[in-house]
C-alpha cells in the first residue's frame, strides 16, 4: 500500500516576524521544525507500510530549507521524499498550496492513500487536506483518531466529533 504523507517545516517558535512588503514569514534566523501534526501523520503512514507493505512518500512544498523536514521523514521511515520549491510559491495560501500538492500527487500517481496532519502550527487553518482531496476528487475524512482497519480496497476509521466518536468506512 503506497501512502503519500504531506509534511511542512514550520517555525519552531511563536516569536516570528512578518515582512511588511510581502506579508510572508521572515524565516532567517528562526529555528524550524517538522510540524508536529505532520509528524503524527508520518508515523501513521509508516505504521500502515509496516502492516500492509508498499512505501511511504513524504512530500513538502516550501523553501529549500524544507529539505531538513524531508530528511527527518526519511529517518522516521519514509522511503522517498519530494520537495516542491520555487520562489513563486512564497507566501502561498492554502488554496495555492493544495493545488500544487494535488498536481504533484497526480504526477506520482501510484498511491493508495494520502495523509495530512490536522493543521500546521504556523497557520492553524486545517484547510490543505480537504482542499487537496477536492482538487484530486478523492474522499476526505477529518479528525481521524484511529485507522481501525484497511482491507480489500476499503478503510474504516474512527474520527472525533463533538459528541464523541464516529466510525466511517470508505473505499480507497
Feature map (PLM): residue ranges:
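N-terminal glycine-rich FAD/FM-binding segment characteristic of electron-transfer flavoproteins
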Residues: 1-172
